[in-house]
Curated annotation (Swiss-Prot):
It catalyses: 5-amino-1-(5-phospho-beta-D-ribosyl)imidazole + S-adenosyl-L-methionine = 4-amino-2-methyl-5-(phosphooxymethyl)pyrimidine + CO + 5'-deoxyadenosine + formate + L-methionine + 3 H(+). Keywords: 4Fe-4S, Iron, Iron-sulfur, Lyase, Metal-binding, S-adenosyl-L-methionine, Thiamine biosynthesis, Zinc. This is Phosphomethylpyrimidine synthase. One of its GO terms (cellular component) is cytosol. It comes from Escherichia coli O17:K52:H18 (strain UMN026 / ExPEC). GO terms for biological process: thiamine biosynthetic process; thiamine diphosphate biosynthetic process. Its EC number is 4.1.99.17.
Amino acid sequence: MSATKLTRREQRAQAQHFIDTLEGTAFPNSKRIYITGTQPGVRVPMREIQLSPTLIGGSKEQPQFEENEAIPVYDTSGPYGDPQIAINVQQGLAKLRQPWIDARGDTEELTVRSSDYTKARLADDGLDELRFSGLLTPKRAKAGRRVTQLHYARQGIITPEMEFIAIRENMGRERIRSEVLRHQHPGMSFGARLPENITAEFVRDEVAAGRAIIPANINHPESEPMIIGRNFLVKVNANIGNSAVTSSIEEEVEKLVWSTRWGADTVMDLSTGRYIHETREWILRNSPVPIGTVPIYQALEKVNGIAEDLTWEAFRDTLLEQAEQGVDYFTIHAGVLLRYVPMTAKRLTGIVSRGGSIMAKWCLSHHQENFLYQHFREICEICAAYDVSLSLGDGLRPGSVQDANDEAQFAELHTLGELTKIAWEYDVQVMIEGPGHVPMQMIRRNMTEELEHCHEAPFYTLGPLTTDIAPGYDHFTSGIGAAMIGWFGCAMLCYVTPKEHLGLPNKEDVKQGLITYKIAAHAADLAKGHPGAQIRDNAMSKARFEFRWEDQFNLALDPFTARAYHDETLPQESGKVAHFCSMCGPKFCSMKISQEVRDYAAAQTIEVGMADMSENFRARGGEIYLRKEEV
């Protein structure tokens, strides 16, 4: 925890300096590589961790070494992870997907914005200093066309996005030759299909079946294609966003870049304060990962925070505004039905979802059905025109372990399954949001219920938190549940930071939440038996046994913390080549002793073997050459 608390002015200045001096930066001893596909422009970034050789013998003067293969890993950092790319936040990122979108010929540029709110913001000269300067001209589908990845998949079309994803999901594991590194324990996949090699056709088939989604708004061409589905690597989402009491555009852009650097596969902008529209534009134009939002938050701002004053018209305008900016997925709380609200009355913690409570209050005050449910087909029509995926929100998720798996939670889940089928009628991609607070023994039921009632659409959960007693450590309490539900089949995990239930996360909190959830996601991939998931673990274990300290730091999810903790005990440079670990010291290091035992055993085997051969030689008469019948 920081010893000195920065003022608001200092925080903004620090964030401004961060984005003004931003450069493409590689992790220690890593380099950016690209693997090209067969379709034009498919060039998939990965991070390759370079390793030092292993000492295998020789003398002090002439040591003998064996090279260790570089380890390729999935990289979400986009251009921010490539030192060869010049970064300019004022201009935004290169439009990677624009040629693919244009080549399909099914979109058209809009001469005027569809949202009245957007028109008003653009006409306000007072916002010029805040506004992102390089605004895109938004596109939408031509009349009678659908531009979603689900639509293309159902037509049998393998898009460049699908080929990009296939290469990315394989993580370059075909480059690894060592049998030691390729060794992997069998997993327990709970029905997931995990092919040894992911092809573009497999990606297309999973998307066509609704088991996976590719969040890829046609107005967010800067994003690098990624996929969310239980038959792929488990993904992690990070939440950022300003509020009425804290943060600024500079700080949110800083948190976006920071999130992608530390492994966020998607980022949700949950802004509720001033300048939501302008903040989101800066985020989208500088984001290499899909961006999600909860549109009801901004719609509520438009009616001065009074839930009862919300209207379908205000919400529709917000959807159009955000779709034309480039938001890749919307969280929509359309499953909070009027008849479900009384089911929460006996709960210990009631309705804890912000979106869920807004819609529950609206339903009760008007005594009408949820207008998101009533207008769901119109929502789907909008999404189909821009390829905005739907994340069907769990507005009635449990907010305490006591309320887990109750009637209200599962009633809403079943409704989300009904809405999924409606969205699929419009070729709109769908994932399902899940809890929440659930004790460990009750977690698996959430996954089985979702698979059965939501037709195997991808599941996306907040944790779940497995206990309620650890404020300040809820990244741990939820990381446990996240690892479990990821193993059972959850496709994406929404991170929880140490500030959960306590305050808004800062930059360091974002990192802590992401590292925790990258651990959970990776543990789930290992448990499922995802092909290649164990390569990095094996490389780390080999480096650890061989006392290759620099390689251990560099293979870590957080090399900087690993190095810092080691250096607290062994700060000298000699400590980084020492053949003992920093915890046990030279005489009690278990791995050093194991190496000595291995060397001794090998020597003993040779000695015993030579003695046996000597005895055999004497028994045969001591002849150098054997008779033919003795061979």
